[in-house]
Amino acid sequence: MKQILRAFLFLLLFTATVNTAIADEKANVTKQGTVRGRIIDATKQTLPGASIYIEKLHTGVTSDVNGFYTFSNLDPGTYTVKVSYVGYSPVELKITIPAGRTLEKDVVLNEGVELQEVVVGGAFQGQRRAINSQKNNMGITNVVSADQVGKFPDSNIGDALKRISGINVQYDQGEARFGQVRGTSADLSSVTINGNRVPSAEGDTRNVQLDLIPADMIQTIEVNKVVTADMDGDAIGGSINLVTKNSPYKRTIAATAGTGYNWVSEKAQLNLGFTYGDRFFNDKLGLIVSASYQNSPSGSYDTEFVWEQDDNGKTYVNDYQIRQYYVTRERQSYSAALDWDINANHKLTFKGIFNNRNDWENRYRTTLKDLDPDGNATVRIQTKAGTPDNRNARLERQRTMDFALGGEHLFGALSMDWHASYAKASEERPNERYIDFQLKKQKFDMDLSDERQPFASSKTGSTMTLNDEFSLKELTEQQEDIKEQDLKFSTNFKLPFKNGNKLKFGAKVVRKTKDKEVDFYEYSPLDEDAFMTNSLANTVDQTNKNFMPNNKYQAGIYASKEYTGSLDLNNASLFEKEQVQEELAGNFNARETVTSGYLRFDQKLTKDVELMTGLRIENTNLAYTGRTYDADEDLTSKTDRQRNSYINFLPSLLVKWNVNDDFKVRGSFTQTLSRPKYSALVPSVNLSLIHI
């Protein structure tokens, strides 16, 4: 109730402010005109974030990410317009606004020259664009351009993000996978492509895998640390917007090729990229297409230890692991963008991007399990692999795609844009296999003098090397299929007033579906002695004198990936097959519909002080189906569909003080939300009766 009351009072204040501005408007606006155009440099590269200022009206705008600007609701007449951009000489020009019509006026800026010194700045053009966008934005933002990303050997967009202040990342095999804004969890920030939220291929969370998208497919990275009313509200940490390449002002052809070498895999890497863009039909139709391919064989050495404390307060290692990974990651990405200028007042756009990542992984792991203070433990030796059609490795295939159709329209003083999009993310893990051997009651001497590198050495009669004393602990195969799909439609309206004030309002509908299906089987050989004989005859030695944590650790001998992958597990004359029902309990089917609307008012309080007030309302409807697991019967079944709905009122207030051209002071108050993880919403039930 308090939340509704706060939102109501905020809306009253908002309405009063807007009404005051509207009262200042002339009743007749049909005779007023509009000027729109694009800011470019001498090479016909667009300049986003340029400042365009009409001196007579004491009002200004900034060019958008494609360099476009618009002034509407202008009285007919002649105006002096000033255009400025960091690193370029400012331009002052006169324009004449026709009554009831739209004037198209592109502006060309030239790079500035100081003291007759010739400065070669081609490598920093995108960086200047990013600085201008940060400088002129109302909120607190960081913008990274393509040329800034290109300075570093970043294979994916996550690695590029880690170079932005306030962003830290979570790694997987040395590559940045999840981004965290201002120290919050990865699922508390939103990741969007061209303003559309990216669905997640993760099973139980809303985290978006940033390592799916190659860095060279993105034109600009925008990190909004303050979420405004016209942005999705589920972004407590902030919003990361990835802007794909836009159609150029002139023909563009670019190709890149690169390579590298990984010392763990001892293999070469390959990076390829291509971009083509041009304009056709008297510059009415713009097109750009891009493709990227990366193949990166790599690996890692790993030691992991779990420390415990006994009853006397003495610390000891309870779990001791040595791991050797071999990983090959292949990325393919394709994007296209089209824009069609129907006339000065109407424009249609299309953008699409498809990303595919194949991740082949083999892991060899030696574990001292349940290690006690006296050095007693069970030795476990495990190989992770896959079937021959997947290179005998665990294949994780993740895909994301986003296709958006949109339009921009100008009706007198009122401008409108709309977007309809389809997005999908998926993860497949076919035939993921684990073979695990164990040997109980082994004794080890533990050297705990170095807490970072504790070391276990076998006592006489004990071993941690696979031999005929070991027995099969576990042989499993898993199939995983996760899909998330989004259908979105949004529309936004913008109405300019006098003195640079603007009213923006709009609505959005998002229909989300997510399904997780995991199938898990355990296999028991009918002749275990023959199976162990075959296993010991098909081993691989992973001993490596260059083991990076310290060469005193050695991974040892394991069942080979080729042997593990070749096992005919579905042959009933060789193996007994059992479906593990408990593993199916995490499956679910989710349906979400989020309907939202917002009001946002931008007001110039003085020449140097700007105020933005806004209110966003989001209505969320949920329908989830989980699984019930009966431990006594060892059966899994679907639950009834559970429904729920809730409404959130999200006010925002931003202030910007332009002390001078190079000094800006910003302040903000915003309210955002975090949607629960899928695992927290799924109606799962575990049943087990205790008999006394």
Language-model segments: which ranges?
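Short, acidic, small-residue-rich periplasmic hinge/interaction motif at the N-terminus
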Residues: 24-32, 36-45, 50-55, 84-88, ...
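Transmembrane beta-barrel strands of outer-membrane/channel proteins
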Residues: 253-261, 272-274, 289-295, 350-356, ...
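N-terminal periplasmic accessory domains that precede
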Residues: 103-107, 157-160, 177-180, 192, ...
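Short acidic/polar hinge/loop motifs at secondary-structure boundaries
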Residues: 72, 197-225
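Transmembrane beta-barrel wall of Gram-negative outer-membrane proteins
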Residues: 267-367, 398-405, 412, 651-653
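Structural signature of Gram-negative outer-membrane beta-barrels, strongest in the C-terminal barrel
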Residues: 341-343, 400-404, 421-423, 482-488, ...
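Extracytoplasmic beta-strand/coil segments of soluble accessory domains associated
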Residues: 158-197
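Short, acidic Ser/Thr/Gly-rich low-complexity loop/linker segments typical of extracellular
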Residues: 57-68
